[in-house]
């Protein structure tokens, strides 16, 4: 007896999420698992965090595995995708989430800092998309991660990071054309301020004289930037990704969706 399809479900699908040991990436991996997908959890540093995500996905009734790979290294990216297919038999969804943040006035930015940011946020994501195209099943999904600072929200001393994410907007638009021959959609999400450990570490940069306020005060100020008067959380991003990679999300293609609760 064939089980009827439930809208929004990802049963039978396999997803890979880069940088999914914590924060937004972890929330995305867990959400895709809840929707029924088997998930490859990728991490670059902490196996402990990644294994916790794997355990949570399994607790919800799906399957998951953690693989270490640095998205700055294209050979490791390619091997990660090969390992994902070898482990689960196929791959349907690739979510590129790995990234680093950077702040600095133009006069102080070094070549090393520029390369550190662009090698992961921009170059790394491009080659994740390339490897995803290579192995994804027909009708697959690719999601890249931009930022609301790429075009909607201007922050002083944030040019390198914002520029690294602005390139993603162009990648999404053009790669959606390249991937059409395999019926693969390519979209992006552009989170605004989202409460994670990274948020608390850098939130003072986004608020004038932010160092004068406590982390809790800065979080409250960020909440009031949205007309909904609440903060964004990783689950808010994960819910949108869950839709974009579903059957129902197919007609959204080549688009970057800003997720900031209307703050920008």
Curated annotation (Swiss-Prot):
UniProt GO BP: secondary metabolite biosynthetic process
Species of the source: Aspergillus novofumigatus (strain IBT 16806)
Upper taxonomic lineage: Eukaryota, Fungi, Dikarya, Ascomycota, Pezizomycotina
Key words of the record: NADP, Oxidoreductase
Entry binding sites for NADP(+): 24, 70, 97, 130, 161, 165, 196
Protein name in UniProt: Short chain dehydrogenase/reductase nsrJ
Keyword presence, NADP: yes
Principal EC category: oxidoreductase
Key word NADP present: yes
Pathway: Secondary metabolite biosynthesis
Record GO terms (molecular function): oxidoreductase activity, acting on CH-OH group of donors
Protein family (similarity comment): Belongs to the short-chain dehydrogenases/reductases (SDR) family.
Gene: nsrJ
Pfam families registered for this protein in UniProt: adh_short_C2
Taxonomic superkingdom: Eukaryota
Function: Short chain dehydrogenase/reductase; part of the gene cluster that mediates the biosynthesis of the tetrahydroxanthone dimer neosartorin, which exhibits antibacterial activity. The two different monomeric units appear to be synthesized by the same set of enzymes, among which the Baeyer-Villiger monooxygenase nsrF is the key enzyme for the divergence of the biosynthetic routes. The pathway begins with the synthesis of atrochrysone thioester by the polyketide synthase nsrB.
UniProt-listed Enzyme Commission number(s): 1.3.1.-
